[in-house]
A protein has these predicted regions:
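Peripheral, non-AAA+ core regions of ATP-driven protein-machinery
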Residues: 3-13, 17-81, 88-94, 101-111, ...
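P-loop (Walker A) phosphate-binding loop of NTP-binding proteins
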Residues: 98, 125
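Conserved RecA-like ASCE P-loop NTPase motor core of nucleic-acid helicases/translocases
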Residues: 120-124
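Divalent metal-dependent catalytic cores for phosphoryl transfer on phosphate-bearing substrates
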Residues: 129
Length: 459
């Protein structure tokens, strides 16, 4: 007698299941996300196997030989920087980004470059083979050695991987794949989780460097279950304004390199090109004689970046002053205004305050505090800051200036780009000032000291 399939209700947000329908998911608390699905019977030979090729045994950690993991350069220098030097055999990378941002273009360029020395396979679930060929032709990419498979059925993809034994595989995208073992539609939580698990298992067993393309939700998170990001080795986000020519790729998680590393690309007629000096791009339109502008030296992974911080402080025309930020934390702005009022004696309670990090950069580190304050003061007084000045440092609630990481590297980058002055935390002052002959460094320990320096007239 055939076994009756059991009906379950699965959450489209977190993937949790419930035996009966409920308005609110009992796992993540979201409303109206439970959908009816059928639980497929588990076969005798379970698909849940170890990702290791052989059966693992208990052994002493001291007996395990730790070898240096070899890196395979992708041919894209900025992508290699984010990955930690290149692709690792058996690594699974998840690349997410908004529609039209250039994910497929970047990976097609990468595959074409790696095909010169590695056996590659591009699996397209969103475009036909003809569409991929047209895109490669438009980008003027060499297609010799690039193997292409237009398929979304997981079992067919697994067969192709076993037959062709590729070394590098791109799956575009994981949300279009489906497995016959799951009854739900492609793109559902269960399908995404199962397909990602099967691909990850094959990548580990066969030593394939695999890149999965992921869609994002309207909130900017990668679509599908959260376990997808835990399952892979590296999570990359492709960011940028579609109205701008510049794109940024950021590592959120990386088991084989540093997280929070940043790579910058420029979109051209022939695809994406790496930008070796992004600070020059972010400061292309910078003028130091403009009130409300200050240059911040921020740190993205191992790379110092110079970003212009713009502030506009104006009289409020309503009962509630506006506080808006682009690229900076809005809660941080509210805190800095309170500190400026209490410890700097400058009240902005009746002023609208707008902040912008030029170039579409998103800055999350507190080192931006010491650049935001001078920018706001400059706009408030309608007086430019001393010329060729940069700043970085964290400001505490009691008005103290706290040190930040990698102060020496930030100062070297500022001097290299021709800046003459720097306001930094006293603890970040270099031991030997002679190492920076062209940079006058002001070490401050309090907010008031920084304000006094900003009051100096332009030379």
């Amino acid at each position: 007698m055939a076994k009756t399939l059991k009906t379950l209700y699965q959450c489209t947000e977190c993937g949790g299941t419930s035996p009966k329908w409920q308005g609110k998911c009992p796992h993540c608390g979201e409303w109206n996300t439970l959908q009816e699905s059928l639980a497929a019977p588990e076969p005798k030979n379970s698909r849940f196997q170890s990702w290791a090729a052989d059966t693992s045994t208990v052994q002493s950690l001291s007996a395990v030989t730790a070898a240096e993991v070899p890196r395979n350069p992708t041919g894209m220098s900025e992508l290699d920087r984010v990955l930690g030097g290149g692709l690792v055999d058996g690594a699974v990378i998840l690349l997410g980004g908004d529609p039209g941002i250039g994910k497929s273009t970047l990976l097609l360029q990468t595959i074409a470059k790696m095909a010169q020395s590695r056996k590659v396979l591009y699996v397209s679930g969103e475009e036909s083979a003809q569409q991929v060929a047209l895109r490669a032709q438009r980008l003027e990419l060499p297609t010799e050695g690039v193997n292409l498979l237009a398929e979304i059925r997981m079992e067919a993809i697994q067969t192709a991987l076993k037959q062709h034994q590729p070394e590098v595989v791109v799956i575009d995208s994981i949300q279009t794949m489906y497995s016959d073992q799951i009854t739900s539609a492609p793109g559902s939580v269960s399908q995404v989780r199962e397909c990602a698990a099967q691909l990850t298992r094959m990548a580990k067993q066969m030593g394939i460097a695999m890149i999965l393309v992921g869609h994002v939700t309207k909130d900017g998170a990668i679509a599908g279950p959260r376990v997808l990001e835990h399952m892979v080795d590296t999570v990359l986000y492709f960011e940028g304004d579609q109205h701008s020519n510049y794109r940024m790729i950021r590592a959120i998680k990386n088991r084989f390199g540093a997280a929070n590393e940043l790579g910058v690309f420029a979109m051209t007629e022939n695809g994406l090109k790496g930008v070796s000096n992004p600070s020059a791009i972010f400061l292309a339109s910078y003028r130091d004689d403009t009130p409300g502008s200050c240059v911040l030296v921020t740190q993205e992974g191992s790379r110092p970046l110079l970003v212009e911080i713009q502030a506009l402080v104006d009289d409020a025309h309503g009962f509630t002053p506006k506080r808006l930020t682009v690229g900076l934390e809005q809660n941080r702005l509210a805190m800095l205004l309170a500190v400026l009022n209490r410890h700097g004696g400058i009240a902005c309670f009746d002023q609208d305050v707008f902040l912008n990090a030029v170039g579409g950069v998103k800055i999350g580190e507190p080192a931006a505090d010491l650049a935001v304050i001078p920018a706001m003061l400059s706009s408030f007084r309608n007086r430019p800051l001393p010329e060729k000045m940069v700043a970085f440092g964290e400001i505490g609630l009691s008005g103290e200036v706290r040190p930040v990481a990698r102060g020496q590297e930030r100062l070297k980058e500022a001097e290299k780009l021709g800046f003459k002055r720097a306001i930094v935390p006293k603890a970040n002052m270099p031991r030997n000032v002679k190492e920076f002959p062209n940079l006058k460094i002001y070490g401050v320990s309090s907010l008031q000291e920084a304000i006094d320096i900003c009051r100096d007239s332009r030379e």
